[in-house]
Amino acid sequence: MADLKQFAEQLVNLTVKEVNELATILKDEYGIEPAAAAVVVAAGGGDGAAEEAQTEFTVVLKDAGASKLAVVKLVKELTGLGLKEAKDVVDGAPSNVKEGVSKEEAEGLKKSLEEAGATVELK
C-alpha cells in the first residue's frame, strides 16, 4: 500500500514535460492511449507550466453591467448568434460567450465587452 501511495505522489508531481513523455511511452510501448494524462496535470502536478501552455481560452460573461442592450448587440456581433440567442447568453450570466479561442482573440473579446460595460473573465 505504501508503494502505491508513493507512486501516486510521484505521478501527481510530474511536470508537463514528464507527463508528455509518459504519454508517449504508454502509447508507443504499451498501445495505451493516455486520455487521462491531462487530468494528472490539472490535478496539481507540475510546476505551473500547465497554465503557461494554455492555448485555448473561454470568454465568460460574468455580468452585463448597466448597458445590457449594448452588451447583447455586441455578443450578437462577436459570436454570430441571433438576437434571441445573444440575449439568452447575456441574461444567463455567468455564461460562456465563446469557447476554444486563442489568447489574442479572447483578450480582444474581453476588451470589447468590457468597453461596453460588461464584466468578463478568461478561463
Swiss-Prot record:
Residues 96-123 are annotated as: Disordered. Residues 100-114 have a biased composition (Basic and acidic residues). GO terms for molecular function: mRNA binding; structural constituent of ribosome. The keyword Transferase does not apply. CDD domains: Ribosomal_L7_L12 (cd00387). Coiled coil: none annotated. GO terms for cellular component: cytosolic large ribosomal subunit. It comes from the Bacteria. It holds the Pfam family Ribosomal_L12. HAMAP family: Ribosomal_bL12 (MF_00368). Homodimer. Part of the ribosomal stalk of the 50S ribosomal subunit. Forms a multimeric L10(L12)X complex, where L10 forms an elongated spine to which 2 to 4 L12 dimers bind in a sequential fashion. Binds GTP-bound translation factors. Belongs to the bacterial ribosomal protein bL12 family. Forms part of the ribosomal stalk which helps the ribosome interact with GTP-bound translation factors. Is thus essential for accurate translation. This is Large ribosomal subunit protein bL12. It comes from Flavobacterium johnsoniae (strain ATCC 17061 / DSM 2064 / JCM 8514 / BCRC 14874 / CCUG 350202 / NBRC 14942 / NCIMB 11054 / UW101) (Cytophaga johnsonae).
